Structure formats: structure tokens, C-alpha cells
């Protein structure tokens, strides 16, 4: 598979392991229009890649993914019709990630927030640096976590804990995330690369079909959940994109102040 047409994502191979790296390090790998479009097709291309059996997803630089790019958020406020296209791409991202038959390991090298957290949590195995934090602060910018977070968090940690984090937008340490079952494993930054390589190579050397079919089977309930409810979640997020509270949150972020929400 040729991945040369990607601009915001880098690729490299180690044997039968394909590494996918979000590559906007100066913006903490925040998702802009270009990266969002590439994410909507990268897992389809990874599935089609005949030279790999395991995929590793990570971020370039100090962060894994800081969620939505603030300039892109402003663009969606200014032209809300564009958010409808974004919503369709969001659906492609989630379902292509769930449809990927190859084991997908997240190397959580740094903070993962919002969409970044959803990208991580929809992976099969999540190995994190103990310096990383994870959370879904959609509500902090006046948005609904309808593009994945509202569905995957309760499946991993239960509704009581999920609602606390989704309603407050609070970030948690990787150590706490491992403790409550949100992620798989936490290691020091010095051994993160080696640990992920060890896991990826072990899985890649296993019974490929049995492993893939085990993943497919395990993902069936998740896929059923997303197929049943994702359209509603993303519709609510589209509605929240048009609210005064969202516009205020983005304006406040740009002005480096705390937003004043009015419930509108």
C-alpha cells in the first residue's frame, strides 16, 4: 500500500507492523480539516495494506492528540454547514477504526483529549506513558462528545465514572486511567517504545486469522452500539456547534480567559 499522499500522517514499517503517526507536532497533533479527512480513510488504507498484520497508532512529539484544532472550530462556527461534512467524516473515522480487522495498538506517548481520546480508546490495546493524561473535554468548549466519547467511555469504565468525566471535561493521569480500566497498561516514557514493540511483534507472530477473527467477534457488540446510536450522537454535536456557549468557549480560548456560559 502506498501512503505517500498523506500530508498530516506519517508511516513506517517494522516487519509486519505498520506504524501510523499523527504529524502536527507544533499543534500537539490537534485535528484540523486536513488531518480529519486523512483520519477518515487511514484505517481503510491500513486494512488494505498487504504488508502488515498489526497497526500501531501514536503521535509525533510530546502529545498524542490535543483534539480539535481551535482555528478549525472557529471555521465551523463561521460556516456551520461545513460541520455536516465533518460529521460524515467523523462517522467514517469511527466505523473504519472498528471495522479494522488487524489488531490496533495505541502508543499513548502524551496527552490525548477530545477526539484524541476517542482515537486512543477505540484502539484494541492502549499502552501509555506515565506522563500522559487523557480526557474528553468536549463540554469545556460547549460541544457534545457525539463523535465517539459518549459511547466508548461508558463501555470501558461504566456509566457512573464515564458521566463524571464527560460532564466535567476533567483529564486524568494515565496511572488513574489504567486503575479504572480505561486503558491497558502504563509504563515509563523510557520503555514505552520497547514495550509497544514487544507487544506488536508478539501479536504479529501469532496465528493471524485466529487473532483477527477474535477481534472481529469481540468488537461485534461495540459495532452494534455505534451503528444503533452514533447518528444521534453526532446530530447532537452538530446542534451544539451552533450554540452561543460553543462560540463563547472558542472566543475565550483565543482570549486566554475562562468562558462565561449562559446555557444558550
Set out the residue ranges of the language-model regions.
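Short beta-strand->loop
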Residues: 225-230, 263
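Hydrophobic alpha-helical membrane-association signature
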Residues: 35-38, 86-89, 192, 233
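Terminal peptide-recognition signature
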Residues: 20, 24, 39, 57, ...
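Short, charged, surface-exposed hinge/linker loops at domain edges
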Residues: 215-224
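A short, glycine- and basic residue-enriched loop/turn
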Residues: 25-28, 61-62, 67-70, 111, ...
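Conserved CoA-thioester-binding segment of acyl-CoA-metabolizing enzymes
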Residues: 1-60, 95
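Crotonase-fold acyl-CoA enzyme core
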Residues: 3, 95-209, 235-238, 242-243, ...
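Glycine- (often His-adjacent) and acidic-residue-rich active-site loop
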Residues: 3, 59-96, 112, 142, ...
Amino acid at each position: 500500500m502506498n501512503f505517500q499522499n498523506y500530508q498530516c500522517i506519517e508511516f513506517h514499517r517494522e516487519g509486519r507492523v505498520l506504524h501510523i503517526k499523527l504529524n502536527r507536532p507544533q499543534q500537539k497533533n490537534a485535528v484540523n480539516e486536513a488531518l480529519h479527512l486523512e483520519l477518515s480513510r487511514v484505517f481503510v488504507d491500513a486494512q488494505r495494506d498487504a504488508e502488515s498484520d498489526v497497526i500501531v497508532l501514536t503521535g509525533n512529539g510530546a502529545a498524542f492528540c490535543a483534539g480539535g484544532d481551535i482555528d478549525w472550530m472557529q471555521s465551523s462556527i463561521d460556516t456551520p454547514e461545513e460541520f455536516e461534512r465533518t460529521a460524515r467524516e467523523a462517522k467514517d473515522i469511527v466505523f473504519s477504526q472498528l471495522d479494522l480487522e488487524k489488531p490496533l495498538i495505541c502508543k499513548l506517548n502524551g496527552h490525548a483529549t477530545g477526539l484524541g481520546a476517542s482515537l486512543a480508546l477505540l484502539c484494541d490495546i492502549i499502552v501509555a506513558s506515565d506522563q500522559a493524561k487523557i480526557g474528553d473535554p468536549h463540554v469545556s468548549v460547549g460541544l457534545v462528545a457525539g463523535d465517539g466519547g459518549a459511547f466508548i467511555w461508558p463501555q470501558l469504565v461504566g456509566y457512573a465514572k464515564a458521566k463524571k468525566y464527560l460532564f466535567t471535561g476533567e483529564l486524568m493521569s494515565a496511572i488513574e486511567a489504567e486503575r479504572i480500566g480505561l486503558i491497558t497498561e502504563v509504563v515509563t516514557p523510557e520503555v514505552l517504545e520497547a514495550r509497544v514493540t514487544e507487544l506488536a511483534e508478539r501479536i504479529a507472530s501469532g496465528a493471524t486469522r485466529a487473532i483477527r477473527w477474535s477481534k472481529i467477534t469481540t468488537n461485534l457488540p461495540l459495532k452494534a452500539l455505534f451503528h444503533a446510536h452514533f447518528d444521534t450522537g453526532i446530530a447532537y454535536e452538530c446542534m451544539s456547534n451552533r450554540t452561543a456557549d460553543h462560540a463563547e468557549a472558542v472566543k475565550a480560548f483565543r482570549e486566554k480567559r475562562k468562558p462565561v456560559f449562559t446555557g444558550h
